[in-house]
Structure formats: C-alpha cells, structure tokens
Amino acid sequence: MSENKENIRTQEEKDLIINARKPEGELGDQLLDRMNESHEKLAQWGVSHLDIEKDDLILDIGCGGGVNVERFLKMTENKVYGLDYSDIAVEKSTRLNQDAIDEGRCEIIHGSVSELPFEDNSFDIVTCFETVYFWPDFVNDSKEVRRVLKDDGIIFICNEAIPTEGDQRQKELIDLLEMKIYSDDQFDQFLREAGFSDIISFSKDGPDSLDKELVTGWLTVIARK
C-alpha cells in the first residue's frame, strides 16, 4: 500500500480514534490504556510548569484512565477529584486509584464539564489534559470551571496539538472526532472572555511519543481566576 504514512488508513484505526471522543466498550478500554502510556511525556512536561502546594484541592476534568489523578495524589496531601463523561473512563480511573479512594483521598465522578457537580469556589486547581478539544462550548464551559475555582485558583490546560496548516492527518482527526484545536492566542482570547486573567502559555515542538515521523506542537496554558 503506497498511501502516505501520515494518513489514517484502516477502518480499525478509524474506529479506535473515533472512540477517543468518548471511550466505550472494549475499544475504549484499549484506547485508555494507550492514552495512559502515550500521553505520559506530555503530561510530565505540562505539569513541570504547574506549582502545586501540599494543601491544594485538585480536580482533573476528562480524567480518562486516571494516571494524572494518581500523579496529583503524590503531589498534594489534599483530596484529588477526577471527572469524566465516559463510563469506562470512570471505571478505569476508579480501579487505578482504588486505594486512595478507600482512604478518602480521592473521588472519581461521572459528569460533564458543562455542568460540574461541585459547589462554587471549591478547588485550587482544575486540570484539563487532552480534553478541551471536545468541550461543547469552550468559553461557557470555561466559565463553569471558573465557578468551581476558588479566588486566585488556576485552570491548567495541556494539549499535544495546535492548529497546523496543511497537516492532512490533523485534518482527518478533526473531521473524525469533530474536535476543535486552539492556538495559544485563541486560548488567551477565550479564557479572557470567560473571566480569567494572568494567562500564560508554554509551547514545545517535538516528535510524537508514538510516531517518530509525526511532529506536533505541545501547548500548556495556565490562567487564574
């Protein structure tokens, strides 16, 4: 087969990718395992820009397989919450962090970013790894995040994709997943519309951790309530 390696070629690959929007069933289970592994370097890089205090209360939106919840449990002595709208993601995150849940240090909740099941002014930090692509309305959903943040609280966004003109694979992913990819300037604009300030971004270009031929732009954005 002589097709470009950067194109999405097989139906199996397409089915797996489509499942990334909301993991379900056996494919979703497999995908979450792959995400836990493939996003690790990105997450480490992103978190290196985040100052976490021992008493910070943290919410991870779109917690997926739960590895970032597990990470934060080692960085704060306070409770860590994970939220996802995928049933299987909630199940996997719960299994991974069961000991902390039993100790009362962790909660994994099924829910949507558009209607967070938390009181106003609850969290010091809300994190979003590889998930804002799928938020129904980024500005309004960011306002909902701001609602549950304490005064001076932080929203942290970590993405491995930025808009890349002429990238055929990215275009296919956008079409397949109905996803939205934002630049640092767009994040700045939309987060300000949502009421955030002190917005800073960090970018890093490098090979994708799974495909050495695919170069992506890593982007971390931090803003304050």
Regions found by a protein language model. Name each.
Residues 125-138:
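A short SAM/SAH-binding and catalytic strip from SAM-dependent methyltransferases
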Residues 161-178:
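Short, glycine-/aromatic-enriched active-site segment of Class I SAM-dependent methyltransferases
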Residues 139-151:
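A short glycine-rich, Lys/Arg-flanked "PGG" loop and its adjoining helix->strand segment in the class I
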